[in-house]
Amino acid sequence: MKIAIFNNHAEHSVIIAKKLILAMKKNNVDIDDRNPDIVVSVGGDGTLLGAFQKYVDQTESVRFVGLHTGHLGFYTDWLSTELDQFVDSLIHDNGQKVSYPLLELTVVRTSGESYKFLALNEAVIKQPIGTLVADIYLGGQAFERFRGDGIAVATPTGSTAYNKANGGAVLHPSLPAIQMSEIASINNRVFRTLGSPLIVPQDQEIVMKPKSNHFLVMYDQEEIKGHNITELRFKVSEKRVHFAQYRHVDFWRRVQNAFISEIE
């Protein structure tokens, strides 16, 4: 088994990553940053997003696992205080995993060229200055002309992030779907949008045709300048992300811990 360790630059994360490397070497586990079987993310959910994007081309063959150096996150099952227990689970790994849906984003340029990207969390299209105007198509048909600050499209696991702040629903990751939410849409007697989040199944895609070239496309922690882009397509990817599952942490428990806390 080959392990890659991806950590943020916070002092505590660096210390934990060094301890983990020493533990792996002590147990004769190979450290391989190029072709790992398991990628260990040391940090928070943002760090795991960075790890996913680094190894996105190996999505089908690697498993991720998060070691959190703060509070328990949505993508991290282990706390840094549980390092010894985590190491024991890692060295006795037998391939156990759980998989979740990914978002496939296709960017079409004016030249006709298209580029595909994968997102674990979400993709956000925003207009830095002024109003974003874009035609939205669903099921191959024109649905609405959006006017506002932007659009967010999230995976089920990403539904607890920006999507939730936009008033979107929290989706269980067992559902193969994506969700579109509006960011500060303009609704009056002249301009109208649906004004509510949309949940789209895996056999359909969302198509967005912006009316300007001055917008930003962000997916996870990556960014694409919105120059010479004529179309953006969003759908559930045929690929899935795989996490090493050494213990079960219920999704709704994660949601409760993050937003509600314990019920008395």
From Swiss-Prot:
KW Cell wall biogenesis/degradation (keyword) present: no
Binding site for NAD(+): D45, G46, N121, E122, R147, D149, A184, Q221
Single GO BP term: NADP biosynthetic process
Gene3D superfamilies: Probable inorganic polyphosphate/atp-NAD kinase, domain 1 (3.40.50.10330), Probable inorganic polyphosphate/atp-NAD kinase, domain 2 (2.60.200.30)
Keywords of the record: ATP-binding, Cytoplasm, Kinase, NAD, NADP, Nucleotide-binding, Transferase
Subcellular location: Cytoplasm
Entry-linked InterPro entries: ATP-NAD_kinase_N (IPR017438), ATP-NAD_kinase_PpnK-typ_C (IPR017437), NAD/diacylglycerol_kinase_sf (IPR016064), NADK (IPR002504)
GO cellular component, one term: cytoplasm
Catalytic residues as annotated in Swiss-Prot or TrEMBL: D45 (proton acceptor)
Any one Gene Ontology molecular-function term assigned to this protein's record: NAD+ kinase activity
Uppermost EC category: transferase
Listed EC numbers: 2.7.1.23
The keyword NADP is assigned to this record: yes
Catalytic function, reaction form: NAD(+) + ATP = ADP + NADP(+) + H(+)
Job of this protein: Involved in the regulation of the intracellular balance of NAD and NADP, and is a key enzyme in the biosynthesis of NADP. Catalyzes specifically the phosphorylation on 2'-hydroxyl of the adenosine moiety of NAD to yield NADP.
NCBIfam families: PRK04885.1 (NF003424)
Protein family: Belongs to the NAD kinase family.
Name the UniProt record assigns to this protein: NAD kinase
Species of the source: Leuconostoc mesenteroides subsp. mesenteroides (strain ATCC 8293 / DSM 20343 / BCRC 11652 / CCM 1803 / JCM 6124 / NCDO 523 / NBRC 100496 / NCIMB 8023 / NCTC 12954 / NRRL B-1118 / 37Y)
